[in-house]
């Protein structure tokens, strides 16, 4: 847990922590044989195996990023149903995060949308709903969105900007998926 999300631990930080605890216990041990045993690699490995087997430390894959209506941002967690933002909570078990926090005027983005839609306010609103719907992962509407048009009209800029903002939530699917 880094304060905003859970990260995959592949740097052996847990092993380092266990080793440190065992060494600290060895220094405090009065019996030299006990101290040597506590500092041994077999003790460190045994403690690590016990910790891995402890159900209090376990989580199933279904528990991570389980609520499709919560969006994790650097500034907090946004409930996509209400639009409300609240502080991060480790109990949400979120592993993904966007690169931006909602708010601000985004004048450059608005100008871009005006340019590529010809100022069509209804199309702006549609694009906003489309992106919001895509954020949830919900299939309630049975919709699949395609951006269609001639070249150099903003499709790639639109998609790439959203992918950058959405951070860990954005994925690319190869065309042969469809």
Segments (PLM) and residue ranges:
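P-loop NTPase catalytic core of nucleic-acid-dependent motor ATPases
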Residues: 1-12, 63-65, 70, 77-178
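Residue-level signal for secondary-structure boundary elements
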Residues: 26-35, 46-47, 55-59, 121-125, ...
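Extended, Lys/Arg-enriched charged tracts that mediate electrostatic binding to polyanionic substrates
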Residues: 33-77, 81
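General helical structural elements
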Residues: 23, 53, 94-97
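Short, small/acidic-rich helices and loops at N termini and domain boundaries
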Residues: 1-48
């Amino acid at each position: 847990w880094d304060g905003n999300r859970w990260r995959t631990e592949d740097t052996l930080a847990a092993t380092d922590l266990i080793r440190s605890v065992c060494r600290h216990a060895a220094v405090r041990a009065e019996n030299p044989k006990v101290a040597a045993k506590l500092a041994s690699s077999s003790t460190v490995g045994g403690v690590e195996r016990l910790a891995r087997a402890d159900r209090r430390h376990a989580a199933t894959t279904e528990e991570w990023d389980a609520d499709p209506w919560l969006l994790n941002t650097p500034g907090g967690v946004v409930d996509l149903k209400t639009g409300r933002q609240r502080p991060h909570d480790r109990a949400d078990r979120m592993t993904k995060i966007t690169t931006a926090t909602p708010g601000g005027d985004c004048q450059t983005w608005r100008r871009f949308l005006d340019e590529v839609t010809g100022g069509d306010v209804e199309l702006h609103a549609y694009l906003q709903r489309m992106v919001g719907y895509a954020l949830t992962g919900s299939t309630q509407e049975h919709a699949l969105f395609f951006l269609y048009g001639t070249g150099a009209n903003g499709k790639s800029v639109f998609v790439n900007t959203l992918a950058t903002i959405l951070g860990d939530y954005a994925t690319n699917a190869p065309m042969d998926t469809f």
